[in-house]
């Protein structure tokens, strides 16, 4: 069992590293979420997870978005199942949407504008997720 825990810790850390190296700011507490998501401007939130579709589809799409011509003001991430209070607080901002991970939420002035939910990620190609994210930021971040 201890070996499994070590393995999972490595998986979690690698998933965190993927997002930090892509240029996203980790929000690990409810207070950090509150401080950032209530700011004026646009924020892309990536709800990270350890599932296969997060690693194979969502995180690569998230990384791509840092290079897209239209940019939100902030790129942040919370980690479902790991930073539970931060994730729960972030989800309170996602009114009208159920809990979903991995997922992306785009907020403007603290208000949810749109989401790309797990069902729009799982089983899709990364480029399809990128296109949904591009459409969202083109609509709300220009």
UniProtKB/Swiss-Prot annotation:
InterPro entries: BrxB/BrxA
Entry's Gene Ontology BP terms: cell redox homeostasis
Gene3D superfamilies for this protein: Glutaredoxin
Family named by the database record: Belongs to the bacilliredoxin family.
UniProt-recorded name of the protein: Bacilliredoxin ABC2448
């Amino acid at each position: 069992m201890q070996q499994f825990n070590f393995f999972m810790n490595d998986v979690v850390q690698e998933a965190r590293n993927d997002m930090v190296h892509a240029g996203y700011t980790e929000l690990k507490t409810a207070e950090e979420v509150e401080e950032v998501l209530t700011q004026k401007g646009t924020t892309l939130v990536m709800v990270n997870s350890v599932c296969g579709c997060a690693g194979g589809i969502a995180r690569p799409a998230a990384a791509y978005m840092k290079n897209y011509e239209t940019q939100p003001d902030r790129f942040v991430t919370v980690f479902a199942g790991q930073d539970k209070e931060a994730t729960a607080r972030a989800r309170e901002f996602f009114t009208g949407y159920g809990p979903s991970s991995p997922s992306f939420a785009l907020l403007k002035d603290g208000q949810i504008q749109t989401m790309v939910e797990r069902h729009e990620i799982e089983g899709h190609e990364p480029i399809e997720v990128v296109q949904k994210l591009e459409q969202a930021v083109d609509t709300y971040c220009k």
